From Swiss-Prot:
Pfam families tied to this protein: GIY-YIG, HHH_5, UVR, UvrC_RNaseH, UvrC_RNaseH_dom
Alphabetized UniProt keyword annotations: Cytoplasm, DNA damage, DNA excision, DNA repair, Excision nuclease, SOS response
Impact upon substituting residue 538 to F/Y: Defective in 5' incision but not in 3' incision
Residue stretches making up the UVR domain: 204-239
Molecular function terms, GO-annotated: DNA binding; excinuclease ABC activity
Name assigned to this protein: UvrABC system protein C
Naturally occurring in which organism (per UniProt): Escherichia coli (strain K12)
GO terms for biological process, alphabetical: DNA damage response; nucleotide-excision repair; response to radiation; SOS response
Family classification: Belongs to the UvrC family.
Transmembrane segments: none
Effect of residue 399 to A/N: Defective in 5' incision but not in 3' incision
Domain GIY-YIG: 16-94
Locations listed in the record: Cytoplasm
GO cellular component, one term: excinuclease repair complex
Length: 610
C-alpha cells in the first residue's frame, strides 16, 4: 500500500448522522461502499484491534481514503448505497456497477417500441429518459425493466427477420411482437405505457392501473391473467419500496458550499423525478482573495456550460448562496436549455432540507480534504528532507506499459502540494522504436515532455523514473542533451527500482545510474509519497495501454471469448434477441442455447460482465 491511512485523524472529522461511505485503495479505486445510521460509530468499528472477520481485515489493510455522504435518513442511505454499488462495483461489496457523456434510456417510436441505451445526439424518433450517471446504471435499469415490463430490447435488424420467438420470449422477458399472434397490439401498447410512466417517476399511476386490471381480470374469472398481473404489481412494489422519493417529482440539482483555510468545496446533490440519484464533491482551485460568491458563480457556470451538449439541465437549481447575478445566470441557463430554469437561493420545505444536506456534505468533505492535504504536506516535507531540497512543490513520475512490445504507452502523472493533480496527467503513444525497448520508450517520452518551453510554475522539483538504474541513465542523457530556455538543472532526477518480489517497502532509490542506491524505512512518510506517485503512474500507463489495445482489436466483446466462433455467436444472438439480451441473461439462460455448455456459458457470462 502506498500510504498509511490515518484513521484517528479521519474519524475526528466524521459526523454521527446517517449516510453512506466509500473506501478507496491506493490506486484511487472504490473498494467498498457501506451505509450507516451513525457514520462515526460505524466507521470507528473498522479500526478496532479485534476485527469481525478476515475479509474486514483485508479490506482495512487496503484503505487509502474514505469519502462520506451524509443523508437525511437511513432510507436515503440505503438508496444511495445501492446507487454507489451499481456505479463503482466495489471489490469488497456483495455485487448486485462519472461519465461525461451521459447515457439515456431510449424508447423508440417504432410500431412495437424497443428499449435501448443511447448516447450522443438525439436524432432518432422516440423518447429519451435520463440522464443516468453511467452506462452500467442504464444496463441495470434495462435489465430490471425487462423483468417487470417485457417489451422488446432487440435491434431492429433482429426484430424484422424473425420467424419464431427468441429465448427472451420463452423465459418471459419479451412479449414476442416479432411473431404475429403472440401478443395483441393493445397489450403491447399498454406495457409500453407502463414503461413510459415508470421512467417518468409515476410509479403510483402504474400501480393504480395494474391493480384495476387485476381486479377486472379476477371479476371476469380470468385467474391466470390476474395472477400474472399480481406478480407484476409485486415486482413494481419491490423496486419502489427501496427508493426515497420527495413530495414532488421535480428534477433539481442542490448545490452546497463550504470554505475554510483557503479551500472551497462545492457539493452537488442530483435529484431526478424526486429521487436522490447521488452526489459529488468538487474542489475548485481558488486564487487568494477571491470572494465566495465568485467561487459559486464561476463553478455553476463551468459546471453547466462546459460540455453542455452532453449535460441535461434540471428544471431547478438550489444554491447555498445569494448571488448578485442570479437572474443573469438563470436567463443564461434557460437560453441554453431552451426552457425556463429556476435558480433559487431561499427554498422552503423539502427543498430547504436538501440544501441543508448539501451544505453539511460540503463541510464534511472539506474537513476531510483539509486533513488529507495536511498529510500530503507532511510527506512532501519529509521527502524534501531526504533529498536535501529546500521544498518539493511539484513532482512528476513516468512509467512504460506494453504487451510483448506492442502498443507501447508511457504515462506521466503529476503531484503538487495537495497530492495528485489528475487534470495534468498525460499519456504518450510511443512509436518508431524496437518492440519491447523500454529504454528507448523512456528516452522518447522525456524528450517529448521536456524538450519544449515550460512555464516556470510547471517545472518539477523532482522527476521520478520508475525502473531503476537503466531508465535513470536514459533520463540523465536526455536532460544533458536538452536545449531549452528553462532551467533544466532544477529538477532532481530520482530512479526507483522495485525490491525483491516487487514488494512495497523494499524499493531502492538512485540519484545516479552508477553505484549503490539507498532505501528508506517502510514507515517513512517520504517513501509513502514515492510509492503513491509511482503506483499512480503505473495505473495510468496500464489504463492507457488497455484502451489502446482495445482500440487496435476493434472486435466485438463476443469475438474475444475463446470457444465462441461465428456459428455460436450467431446462435447466441439469435436466441437472446441481440447482444443486449445476452448481456442481461444469467448463466443458466445462456446454457439453454443449443451448442453452449454450462462451462462455456459461465465463461461467456463473466466475459460480458467484466
Amino acid at each position: 500500500m502506498s500510504d498509511q491511512f490515518d484513521a484517528k485523524a479521519f474519524l475526528k472529522t466524521v459526523t454521527s448522522q446517517p449516510g453512506v461511505y466509500r473506501m478507496y485503495d491506493a490506486g484511487g479505486t472504490v473498494i467498498y461502499v457501506g451505509k450507516a445510521k451513525d457514520l462515526k460509530k460505524r466507521l470507528s468499528s473498522y479500526f478496532r484491534s479485534n476485527l469481525a472477520s478476515r475479509k474486514t481485515e483485508a479490506l482495512v489493510a487496503q484503505i487509502q481514503q474514505i469519502d462520506v455522504t451524509v443523508t437525511h435518513t437511513e432510507t436515503e442511505a440505503l438508496l444511495l448505497e445501492h446507487n454507489y454499488i451499481k456505479l463503482y462495483q466495489p471489490r469488497y461489496n456483495v455485487l448486485l456497477r462519472d461519465d461525461k457523456s451521459y447515457p439515456f434510456i431510449f424508447l423508440s417510436g417504432d410500431t412495437h417500441p424497443r428499449l435501448a441505451m443511447h448516447r450522443g445526439a438525439k436524432h432518432a424518433k422516440g423518447e429519451y429518459f435520463g440522464p443516468f450517471p453511467n452506462g452500467y446504471a442504464v444496463r441495470e435499469t434495462l435489465a430490471l425493466l425487462q423483468k417487470i415490463f417485457p417489451i422488446r430490447q432487440c435491434e431492429n435488424s433482429v426484430y424484422r427477420n424473425r420467424s419464431r420467438p427468441c429465448l427472451q420470449y420463452q423465459i418471459g422477458r419479451c412479449l414476442g411482437p416479432c411473431v404475429e399472434g403472440l401478443v395483441s397490439e393493445e397489450e403491447y401498447a399498454q406495457q409500453v405505457e407502463y414503461v413510459r410512466l415508470f421512467l417518468s417517476g409515476k410509479d403510483d399511476q402504474v400501480l393504480t392501473q395494474l391493480i384495476s386490471r387485476m381486479e377486472t381480470a379476477s371479476q371476469n374469472l380470468e385467474f391466470e391473467e390476474a395472477a400474472r398481473i399480481r406478480d407484476q404489481i409485486q415486482a413494481v412494489r419491490r423496486v419502489t419500496e427501496k427508493q426515497f422519493v420527495s413530495n414532488t417529482g421535480d428534477d433539481l440539482d442542490v448545490i452546497g458550499v463550504a470554505f475554510d483555510a483557503g479551500m472551497a468545496c462545492v457539493h452537488v446533490l442530483f435529484i431526478r423525478q424526486g429521487k436522490v440519484l447521488g452526489s459529488r464533491s468538487y474542489f475548485p482551485k481558488v486564487p487568494g482573495g477571491t470572494e465566495l460568491s465568485e467561487v459559486v458563480e464561476t463553478f455553476v457556470g463551468q459546471f453547466y456550460l462546459q460540455g453542455s451538449q452532453m449535460r441535461t439541465l434540471p428544471g431547478e437549481i438550489l444554491l447555498d448562496f445569494n448571488l448578485s447575478d442570479k437572474t443573469l445566470l438563470a436567463d443564461s441557463l434557460s437560453e441554453l436549455a431552451g426552457r425556463k430554469i429556476n435558480v433559487q437561493t431561499k427554498p422552503r420545505g423539502d427543498r430547504a432540507r436538501y440544501l441543508k444536506l448539501a451544505r453539511t456534505n460540503a463541510a464534511t468533505a472539506l474537513t476531510s480534504k483539509l486533513s488529507q492535504q495536511s498529510t500530503v504536506h507532511q510527506r512532501l516535507t519529509a521527502l524534501a528532507s531526504v533529498l536535501k531540497l529546500p521544498e518539493v512543490k511539484r513532482m512528476e513520475c513516468f512509467d512504460i506499459s506494453h504487451t510483448m512490445g506492442e502498443q507501447t504507452v508511457a504515462s506521466c502523472v503529476v503531484f503538487d502540494a495537495n497530492g495528485p493533480l489528475r487534470a495534468e496527467y498525460r499519456r504518450y503513444n510511443i512509436t518508431g522504436i524496437t518492440p519491447g525497448d523500454d529504454y528507448a520508450a523512456m528516452n522518447q517520452v522525456l524528450r517529448r515532455r521536456y524538450g519544449k518551453a515550460i512555464d516556470d510554475s510547471k517545472i518539477p522539483d523532482v522527476i521520478l523514473i520508475d525502473g531503476g538504474k537503466g531508465q535513470l541513465a536514459q533520463a540523465k542523457n536526455v536532460f544533458a542533451e536538452l536545449d531549452v530556455s528553462w532551467d533544466k538543472n532544477h529538477p532532481l532526477l530520482l530512479g526507483v527500482a522495485k525490491g525483491a518480489d516487487r514488494k512495497a517497502g523494499l524499493e531502492t532509490l538512485f540519484f545516479e545510474p552508477e553505484g549503490e542506491g539507498f532505501s528508506l524505512p517502510p514507515d517513512s512518510p517520504a517513501l509513502h509519497v514515492i510509492q503513491h506517485i509511482r503506483d499512480e503512474s503505473h495505473d495510468h500507463a496500464i489504463g492507457g495501454h488497455r484502451k489502446k489495445r482495445a482500440k487496435v482489436k476493434n472486435t466485438s466483446s463476443l469475438e474475444t471469448i475463446e470457444g465462441v466462433g461465428p456459428k455460436r455467436r450467431q446462435m447466441l444472438l439469435k436466441y437472446m434477441g441481440g447482444l443486449q439480451g445476452l448481456r442481461n441473461a444469467s448463466v443458466e439462460e445462456i446454457a439453454k442455447v443449443p451448442g453452449i455448455s454450462q462451462g462455456l456459458a459461465e465463461k461467456i457470462f463473466w466475459s460480458l460482465k467484466h
